[in-house]
């Protein structure tokens, strides 16, 4: 019940702002799906495109999922949380949740865009790990139907949830590529030196103490 309440609050927090934002996005897809708890709370179509980050579309479903996640996290640590109360100077709990959510979806979108640009995809081992993880979830919740109910409580479709899970593995593959000498993403010495110069960093080979 608490999860449902949190998601309803998340929907109320964001509905007015996002409805306005989507109305300003012109040619972006507004969506047609009407399923899910977060749609009931916000009135936003899950498949509606909310924003573009590096050419990667962020759907209302993904944004609302992460917003509900943030709200649930905050409500765990702040009893009877007042979302309009000030957390810090000029920033309410509601503001913080929305800002943090935006940073999360931006990160996930950038990872997907960079992976696509670099031709990085999931490996067979990644897919096996994802399949094993799903099986763990199904077992934990007591079967396939129970797992699907849990996703419904979270207000997200399995397709969207899988998309999020896969991004974590793409992030690891990107990290591997950046750290593997000889890969297309591995920065050479000149690139690192230029980056240091552009950002006013000091570099050195040996530090004597």
Describe the role of every protein-language-model region:
Residues 34-37, 162, 169-207:
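Acidic/polar surface patches and capping/hinge elements
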Residues 91, 111, 208-209:
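Acidic/histidine-rich, surface-exposed loop or edge segments in extracytoplasmic proteins
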Residues 142, 147-161:
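Structured, amphipathic secondary-structure segments that form assembly/contact surfaces
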Residues 1-99, 202:
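Short, low-structural-confidence N-terminal segments
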Residues 84-93, 104-106, 122-143:
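Acidic helix-start/capping segments at beta-turn-to-alpha-helix junctions
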Residues 58, 63, 127-130, 161, ...:
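Hydrophobic/aromatic residues in well-formed alpha-helices
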């Amino acid at each position: 019940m608490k999860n449902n309440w949190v998601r309803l609050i998340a929907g109320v927090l964001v509905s007015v702002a996002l409805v306005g934002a989507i109305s300003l996005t012109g040619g972006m897809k507004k969506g047609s799906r009407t399923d899910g708890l977060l749609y009931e709370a916000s009135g936003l179509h899950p498949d509606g495109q909310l924003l573009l980050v590096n050419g990667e579309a962020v759907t209302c479903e993904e944004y609302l999922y992460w917003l509900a996640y943030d709200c649930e996290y905050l409500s765990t640590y702040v009893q009877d949380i007042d979302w309009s109360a000030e957390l810090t100077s000029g920033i309410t709990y509601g503001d913080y949740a929305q800002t943090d959510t935006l940073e999360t979806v931006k990160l996930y979108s950038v990872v997907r865009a960079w992976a696509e640009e670099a031709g990085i995809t999931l490996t067979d081992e990644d897919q096996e790990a994802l399949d094993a993880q799903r099986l763990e979830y199904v077992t934990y919740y007591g079967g396939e139907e129970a797992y699907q109910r849990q996703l419904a409580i979270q207000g997200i479709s399995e397709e969207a949830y899988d998309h999020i899970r896969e991004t974590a593995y793409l992030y690891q593959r990107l990290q591997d590529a950046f750290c593997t000498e000889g890969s297309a993403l591995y920065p050479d010495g000149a690139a690192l030196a230029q980056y240091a110069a552009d950002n006013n960093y000091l570099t050195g080979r040996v530090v004597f103490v």
